[in-house]
Curated annotation (Swiss-Prot):
E.C. no: 2.8.5.2
Pfam family, one: SoxA-TsdA_cyt-c
Gene that encodes the chain: soxA
NCBIfam families the record matches: thiosulf_SoxA (TIGR04484)
Name this protein carries in UniProt: L-cysteine S-thiosulfotransferase subunit SoxA
Organism phylogeny: Bacteria, Pseudomonadati, Pseudomonadota, Alphaproteobacteria, Rhodobacterales
Oligomeric form and interacting partners: Heterodimer of SoxA and SoxX.
Binding site for heme c 2: 206, 209-210, 251
Length: 290
């Protein structure tokens, strides 16, 4: 991927830099999130102490929920109002559907979706059998292809988004706890390198927005810390679900760079690194964002 291109891109980067330099700062909204569900209220940790490797960067890490307006935050307080729950229901239909060539369903092996509780909180992770870094999409596709005999689902396809929404919901309220040591360490380091590398004509890195300018207002948007504990999320701008891999493509493309592909080894490593920056926050299951 090209890091940057000079000429017009440099001028655009300068203009954006000036905009950021003059941007107004707004503290994250001081609020607490308790979600009303059919099973009762679920308290969500949306701010906490940073992981050790970020201790010199942030005093507190915040879920992106704190950087949204009142109406958007309120949509997440009750499952009845949360538009993402439609996609959870679609995922449940797929879970129980006899999709396999021999009539297998997800439930045939895993029983109810609650068997997935805790998975979202530790993803991505290095698979103990293959030694490869796996995102949740990889595990879903392993079942789809190897156990059901179907064609692989696209990483950002509707089928995948529906299933990820259902699976993620089972870990709602659990603390994000991805491993970054041992076999995960080289992948984590690669993801960190991507996070701090400037890309595109705008010569911007992930850190430029979500670390250097977190809390600033630009183009009526309140820049967050870029946490992904709420993904997959219902994005009001897109009127649909967005996964972390999907969002990475959009972010890099916004720098006017030729982006890595969703589900690529590079974006898997980036997802591991970004997820680790939110260790200690709660999985929000399916959140709502602008």
């Amino acid at each position: 991927m090209p890091r940057f291109t000079k000429t017009k891109g440099t001028l655009a980067a300068t203009a954006l830099g000036l905009a950021l330099a003059g941007a107004a700062f707004a503290d994250p909204v001081e609020d607490g999130l308790v979600i009303e569900t059919d099973s009762g209220p679920v308290e969500i940790v949306t701010k906490t102490a940073p992981p050790a490797f970020l201790a010199d960067t942030f005093d507190t890490i915040y879920s992106g929920w704190h950087f949204r307006d009142d109406s958007t935050r309120d949509l997440e307080r009750d499952d009845f109002d949360n538009p993402a729950m439609v996609f959870v229901d679609r995922g449940l239909d797929k879970w129980n559907a006899a999709m396999g060539v021999n009539g297998e369903s997800c439930a045939s092996c895993h029983q109810g979706p609650e068997s997935m509780a805790g998975l979202r909180a530790v993803m991505p992770r290095v698979d103990e059998h293959t030694g490869k870094l796996m995102i949740m999409e990889d595990y879903v596709n392993a079942c789809v292809t190897e156990r059901m005999g179907l064609e692989k689902w696209g990483v950002t396809s509707d089928n995948m988004k529906d299933m990820l929404s259902l699976i993620s919901l089972q870990s709602r309220g659990m603390a994000v706890n991805v491993k970054i040591d041992g076999p995960a360490a080289p992948y984590w380091e690669h993801g960190k390198e991507i996070y701090y590398t400037r890309y595109g004509q705008l010569e911007m890195s992930c850190a430029n927005c979500h670390e250097d300018n977190a809390g600033n207002m630009i183009r009526a948007d309140h820049l967050s810390q870029g946490q992904i504990n709420g993904f997959p999320t219902y994005r009001l701008k897109d009127s649909g679900m967005v996964t972390a891999q999907h969002r990475f493509v959009g972010c890099v493309r916004d720098t006017r760079a030729e982006t890595f592909k969703a589900g690529s080894d590079d974006f898997k490593a980036l997802e591991l690194y970004v997820a680790s920056r939110g260790n200690g926050l709660s999985v929000e299951g399916v959140s709502v964002r602008h």
